[in-house]
UniProtKB/Swiss-Prot annotation:
This is Nuclear receptor ROR-alpha A. Its main location: nucleus. It comes from Danio rerio. GO terms for cellular component: nucleus. It is found in: Nucleus. It comes from the Eukaryota. Keywords: Activator, Biological rhythms, Developmental protein, DNA-binding, Metal-binding, Nucleus, Receptor, Transcription, Transcription regulation, Zinc, Zinc-finger.
Amino acid sequence: MMYFVISAMKAQIEIIPCKICGDKSSGIHYGVITCEGCKGFFRRSQQSNAAYSCPRQKNCLIDRTSRNRCQHCRLQKCLAVGMSRDAVKFGRMSKKQRDSLYAEVQKHRLQQQQRDHQQQPGEAEPLTPTYGLSTNGLTELHDDLSGYMNGHTPDGTKPDSGVSSFYLDIQPSPDQSGLDINGIKPEPICDFTPGSGFFPYCSFTNGETSPTVSMAELEHLAQNISKSHMETCQYLREELQQMTWQAFLQEEVENYQSKPREVMWQLCAIKITEAIQYVVEFAKRIDGFMELCQNDQIVLLKAGSLEVVFVRMCRAFDPQNNTVYFDGKYAGPDVFKSLGCDDLISSVFEFGKNLCSMHLSEDEIALFSAFVLMSADRSWLQEKVKVEKLQQKIQLALQHVLQKNHREDGILTKLICKVSTLRALCSRHTEKLTAFKAIYPDIVRAHFPPLYKELFGSDFEQSMPVDG
C-alpha cells in the first residue's frame, strides 16, 4: 500500500541563501541560486524590458527586507551575480561548476551545523531550508516551459522515475518556545466541560477529554503558538504593507491572462506548495503536535494545511483594492482568469476580504490557524482523544487572547464559523484540480510539485492506512 512519504531530507542546493537578497533559496534560476521572489522579479524584468530608475545613489542595499524598495539596484545585482535569460537553456552543468556548487553546499552545511551546535537551549532558531521547496524537475515558467517540459532537473539530468524527491519533513524541530514553564505555579485553573457550552462548535467523543488547564499553561501555549507563527511566516506584515502599492499593471495582468491554462495552474500549485511548507514548520513548532503519533501528524497536515494557507492569506490581502500578494506584486482576481476557476477565485477573495474585516492581530491569526490545523474531526485519526485535548487547549488559549485583547463578544463564534467556509473552499479546490487533472493528466503527473500531488491527489483515500 502506498503511504505518505516522509523523510528528513538533507537540504542541498537550497541550503545556500539567495545570491541576491539572502532569503531562503529555492534552486538555480536563470543560472544563479535565488529565492522565488528574486526569480520572479528577474523574469518580469526580462519580459517587460523595464527601464528602472534609482531614486538614490544607485548603491541601495538589497536584502530580504529592502529588496522591493529599489527595482533598479535589485536588477543590477541580479545581472552582477550572473543571472541571464540564456542560462535557462544552457543545459548540463560542467564538472567544474558541479564541483564548485558541491563545495559551496558543503560549506553552508558546515556553517549550519556550527550554528546549530552553538544554539542555546530555548533560543529561537531561524527557518532552515529543510522544509524548503525543491525545484527538481521544475524550471522557469511560460517562456521557459519548453525546457521544463523536457523534464530536466536544474543540473541538466533526467529526474528520477522512482520515488519523488519532494518530502514532507515532520521530523522534530528543536525547542522553539524560548519559554520556561518549569516552576510556574498552576494557581488559577480553568475547567471547561463540553456541557458548559464553552466549545459550542466542537464535537468531542466523551466528557473525559475536557482539559483542566492553568492560566499559566494557557499563556505559555498562546506565546508558543504566536512565536511559532511569526517564525514561520513567509513575509512580515510590515513588508506586505509596504508592498501594497505594487499592484500588477494592466499589461502584466494581460500577460498572466494570456498564459496557457496548464502553465498558470502549475505556477499556482508551486506557490501553494511553498506556502504549505511554512505551515508544516509552523505545526512542528506547536507544543503538543510532535507528541501526536506520526499517522495523526500526517492526517492533520494533509487535511488542514491548505485551510491554514487561506487563513494566513488575510495577512497578504488588501481589502481596499481587493488584491492579494502573488508572484511579487499585488494581484486582483483578473490575474487568475486563465485558470478557468472564476467561482473558486471569487470565493477565495471573498473569504480573504471577510477575514480581513475582523482585523485580527498576529496572535489571533496564529491561534486560529493552530485551531484549524488541529481539527479533531478529521477522518483516519488513530488517537482522536489526544487530538481533541490539544484542540481544546488551543481553543482555550484563543479565547484567552481574545479576552485579553478586549475583542467584542461573539468574535470566537464568528471565527469558528469560518471553519465550514474553509472546508468548502478546500473541497472546491480539490474539485477543480480533479477536473483539470482529467484534461491534463500528464502535466499533473509529471510536472506538478510532488507534495502538492500527495496532499490533493485523488489517490489520497487509498493511500491512507486503514485501522484494524
